[in-house]
């Protein structure tokens, strides 16, 4: 094509010149071929040659190119290009097709970019704020309490806020007071309480989260044993069921320790000594704490807080601790339950396989270690107890109990039975009995999950290393069967504590009678301290 022979005047591009020849009835060309034909036809137009020559001259002379002026007028006359050429065959495909690019109002663009919807906030770093009605209701109760205390409340006056406004057990009052008053000014004002309880979104939390946040230390994501000490101190100072202990500080401290150890034994399933919010929610501690405000008889709250249960635990420890140095060794523990345990299982306990001792004295068990032991021994059906004894019997620590490991422990049981002229039982028979009771997934071994899935798991461990309980199981002790039927809701530990407290109380009464106390039978049974 001779560009130099073309007139320099810029002509208006006629859209009709871009029309393709009429289509034959033959099959339609592919879209790419149609585009090539259109482009070739455009290049052959005189106006195109003029435009190209003009752009080349501008480029050689260094003149800035004004693209909008150089474009043919057809591209400036409308914001959209013209329709594609009509086919002579009248094909509906060409009569309907548009080549315009997508615009803001294009339905294609609407499909690709849907309108943004406003999603309401669902995450709140410090908890969901209270609803307007709930907030107003709480403020009304706060105003009612603080109306008589314009300058604020002291700790002994704060209990009404804890119970009426916060709906929490009253013995949490000092802990809540100190949380709002970290600078120890000994007074909590209305504004300070509102800032902590309402503005801090404590109002909308569940009870477990509220108690967890009140008790935990700043910056900690768990509860320690020491965090429960203020709660127990207030309970001992105010609960009518513990009034008799208020003049005996030594046993107040022992009672508080025992309650805390029991809480961590059953609820702190990780065994780390760090109680998480999840563990607190999963346990039954909150229900027991709420019951304390409703029940004056502390012994009716058998979960954690029963004084009778503490009495049994402490007296058992005192009986074994011959030199009363507050430590127990192997020789002491082997006497537990009238020498019921085997030496092999006691060795495993003192090897600290099921749990590391808190005692700093080599070969000695502390009072806390004993609490864990006695709860495991007398409540073998509970999950913490099953985990405790499973670790003891799993000699190689591979997560399964094999027949060889069970035989290792039963050998000593068999020897003890022979020593007391008791009819011996073959281990093969015992093994079949255990398999029938547990129904493990694999018959050649027993897993922890197998034990947790059976109601007879406690009997397995009694067979292996507790002779007295094994014999009671074999003879089907009618007293134990009757006791289980009388109250099926009680745990093994509850029934044990009930029996032992009755026995210990009777022994105490006999001692008083032998010492010349004539009025002992006229007095109700109660602990000596």
Curated annotation (Swiss-Prot):
Cited function: Probable regulatory subunit of type 2A protein phosphatase.
One Pfam short name: EF-hand_13
Every EF-hand domain range: 381-416
Membrane-crossing segments per the record: none
Protein name: Probable serine/threonine protein phosphatase 2A regulatory subunit B''epsilon
Entry keyword set: Calcium, Metal-binding
Subunit relationships: PP2A consists of a common heterodimeric core enzyme, composed of a 36 kDa catalytic subunit (subunit C) and a 65 kDa constant regulatory subunit (PR65 or subunit A), that associates with a variety of regulatory subunits. Proteins that associate with the core dimer include three families of regulatory subunits B (the R2/B/PR55/B55, R3/B''/PR72/PR130/PR59 and R5/B'/B56 families) and cell signaling molecules.
PROSITE patterns found in the cross-reference section: EF_HAND_1, EF_HAND_2
Chain sites annotated for binding Ca(2+): 394, 396, 398, 405
Residue numbers spanned by region Disordered: 60-110, 507-529
Compositionally biased intervals (Acidic residues): 520-529
CDD domains: PPP2R3A_B-like (cd21504)
GO molecular function: calcium ion binding
Bias (Low complexity): 71-109
Superkingdom: Eukaryota
Disulfide bonds: none
Organism whose genome encodes this protein: Arabidopsis thaliana (Mouse-ear cress)
């Amino acid at each position: 094509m001779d560009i130099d022979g073309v007139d320099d005047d810029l002509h208006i591009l006629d859209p009709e010149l871009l029309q393709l020849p009429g289509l034959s009835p033959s099959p339609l060309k592919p879209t790419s071929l149609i585009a090539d034909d259109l482009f070739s036809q455009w290049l052959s137009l005189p106006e195109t040659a003029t435009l190209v020559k003009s752009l080349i001259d501008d480029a050689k002379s260094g003149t800035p190119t004004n693209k909008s002026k150089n474009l043919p007028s057809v591209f400036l006359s409308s914001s959209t290009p013209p329709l594609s050429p009509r086919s002579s065959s009248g094909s509906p495909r060409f009569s309907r097709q548009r080549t315009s690019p997508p615009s803001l109002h294009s339905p294609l663009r609407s499909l690709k970019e849907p309108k943004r919807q406003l999603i309401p906030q669902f995450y709140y770093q410090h908890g969901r704020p209270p609803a307007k009605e709930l907030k107003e209701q709480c403020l009304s109760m706060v105003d009612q309490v603080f109306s008589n205390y314009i300058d604020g409340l002291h700790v002994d006056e704060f209990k009404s806020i804890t119970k009426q406004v916060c709906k929490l057990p009253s013995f949490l009052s000092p802990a809540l007071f100190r949380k709002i008053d970290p600078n120890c000014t000994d007074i909590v004002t209305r504004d300070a309480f509102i800032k902590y309880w309402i503005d801090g979104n404590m109002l909308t939390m569940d009870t477990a989260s509220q108690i967890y946040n009140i008790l935990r230390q700043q910056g900690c994501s768990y509860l320690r044993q020491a965090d429960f000490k203020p709660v127990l101190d207030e309970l001992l100072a105010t609960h009518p069921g513990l009034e008799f202990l208020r003049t005996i500080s030594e046993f107040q401290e022992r009672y508080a320790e025992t309650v805390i150890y029991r809480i961590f034994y059953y609820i702190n399933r990780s065994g780390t000594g760090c109680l998480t919010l999840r563990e607190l929610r999963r346990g039954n501690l909150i229900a027991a704490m709420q019951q304390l405000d409703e029940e004056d008889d502390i012994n009716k709250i058998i979960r954690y807080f029963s004084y009778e249960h503490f009495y049994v635990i402490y007296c058992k420890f005192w009986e074994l601790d011959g030199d009363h140095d507050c430590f127990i060794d192997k020789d002491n523990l082997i006497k537990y339950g009238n020498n019921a345990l085997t030496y092999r299982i006691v060795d495993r306990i003192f090897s600290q396989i099921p749990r590391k001792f808190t005692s700093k004295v080599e070969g000695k068990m502390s009072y806390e270690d004993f609490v864990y032991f006695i709860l495991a021994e007398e409540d073998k059906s509970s999950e913490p107890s099953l985990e405790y004894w499973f670790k003891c019997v799993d000699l190689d620590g591979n997560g399964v109990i094999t027949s060889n490991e069970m035989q290792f422990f039963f050998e000593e049981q068999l020897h003890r039975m022979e020593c007391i002229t008791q009819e011996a039982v073959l281990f093969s028979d015992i093994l079949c009995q255990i398999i029938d009771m547990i129904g493990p997934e694999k018959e050649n071994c027993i897993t922890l999950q197998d034990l947790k899935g059976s109601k007879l798991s406690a009997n397995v461990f009694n067979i292996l290393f507790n002779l007295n309980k094994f014999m009671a199981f074999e003879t089907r002790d009618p007293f134990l069967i009757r006791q289980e039927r009388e109250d099926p809701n009680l745990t093994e530990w509850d029934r044990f504590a009930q029996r032992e407290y009755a026995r210990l109380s009777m022994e105490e009464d006999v001692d008083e009678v032998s010492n010349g106390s004539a009025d002992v039978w006229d007095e109700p049974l109660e602990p000596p301290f």
